[in-house]
């Protein structure tokens, strides 16, 4: 095993794990499920299925410098220019035949409105089975039972499509892995608050993936363990004059101007992204579906914009950030809509 040196070494290995997962889904679409970033994937990992998600696909394609071809193809077919870039790229990949038909398409009503539109279009295009998990705006026991039953129903559909039953022991194992990963991420955040590290936008996206689509998979847990090891050896934050930046929303790792500012000019370092910390609640492996449901319901991206803003401010303070960047683009109406409120709250 290669010896760890800094956070970038952990990023590199996680990038490899994400790329292998995406390639596995492209090679074996009959064992892949297209999901949005908020969909619990522990039951997929337990069934040996690969989650394919627009954010990962689009970043992977952006590294090949051909994402514009797919975005333009989607626009020609009627997708608005102002639609989410991640989902627009994914739709263009599907309409050009590059993205094969998956076993199932599954999304949630949480936060991202683009996934409900693009996933329905994908399901009609292939055609492919579509499941949408309805996430209420409250988190009481009735809501937990309601969402848990939907997740069980999705699992039954997957069992019918694959001809294989879910192994409950494997699901509990995946849930235990997920619980450890979230606990480790909380531990890493406490360490990260006091040290300085060389960071990249792609690396922060890796952290987001580790606490979402690869949550419950060994790759996600191993990545966070590596982050902890590098943070323990990192210099104290007082040893640098770089500004510590906390990022709200996904990071545009393809944008040269942002790369220069946040990576190459050595003026700033990223200390975190709000989406990584949107739901770090403890999980009960003995109640897997209820735990997945509760994580969806307590996610700060559900409900009012104030929940997300309050959570971002709290984590920015915990991580000793000097400033916050809220990345707005046409595609994410929720993030763009909360920008003025967030600016006012951050400047108070």
Segments and roles (model prediction):
Residues 1-31, 148, 152, 156-282, ...:
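A charged, amphipathic alpha-helical module
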Residues 43-72, 246-313, 317:
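Redox- and metal-dependent alpha/beta enzyme cores, enriched for Fe-S-associated oxidoreductases
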